[in-house]
């Protein structure tokens, strides 16, 4: 992705030049808002397939009987989605969100490789900041404390999501 967003020979600038005919160089990894856009595109590109597989597994595991009954009752496609599909795949959505929230620590390598937190540490995320603080700034105590707090926040978010999954399963068994 660093090569794709390179301002001189990058694929994105070449595609934009081919489409628009304007030879304007866009500094994707140097400009702050564009740097975040480039990081976001790279991260979405890398994480979307796994999330789609989880959600597709959830959709394929849905029972057909409620949908057939809704069809007989004359429910529209939107009503079937809102009243049947969405509530039944919510455990899979919560699981995907929990995995994704824990996977956010992996974003460190994308930021480190593409922008290294620059320009001026403005595309820095929590894990790159903890790394820079601990190893470049030699402040191991603060870096360790920040990483513990971040892990605890991730744990609490995951606990909240799984609590909702268990609550929805408990209500479904009643």
Model-predicted regions and their roles:
Residues 1-174:
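A structural signal for multi-pass alpha-helical bundles of membrane permease subunits
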């Amino acid at each position: 992705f660093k090569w794709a967003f390179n301002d001189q020979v990058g694929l994105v600038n070449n595609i934009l030049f081919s489409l628009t005919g304007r030879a304007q160089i866009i500094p994707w990894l140097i400009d702050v808002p564009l740097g975040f856009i480039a990081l976001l595109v790279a991260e979405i590109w890398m994480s979307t397939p796994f999330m789609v597989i989880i959600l597709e597994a959830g959709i394929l595991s849905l029972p057909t009987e409620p949908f057939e009954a809704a069809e007989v009752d004359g429910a529209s496609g939107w009503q079937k989605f809102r009243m049947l599909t969405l509530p039944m795949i919510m455990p899979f959505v919560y699981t995907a969100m929990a995995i994704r929230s824990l996977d956010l620590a992996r974003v460190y390598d994308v930021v480190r490789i593409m922008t290294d937190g620059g320009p001026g540490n403005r595309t820095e995320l929590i894990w790159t900041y903890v790394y820079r603080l601990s190893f470049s700034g030699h402040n191991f105590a603060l870096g360790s404390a920040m990483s513990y707090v971040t892990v605890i926040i991730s744990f609490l978010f995951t606990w909240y999501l799984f609590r909702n999954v268990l609550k929805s399963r408990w209500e479904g068994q009643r």
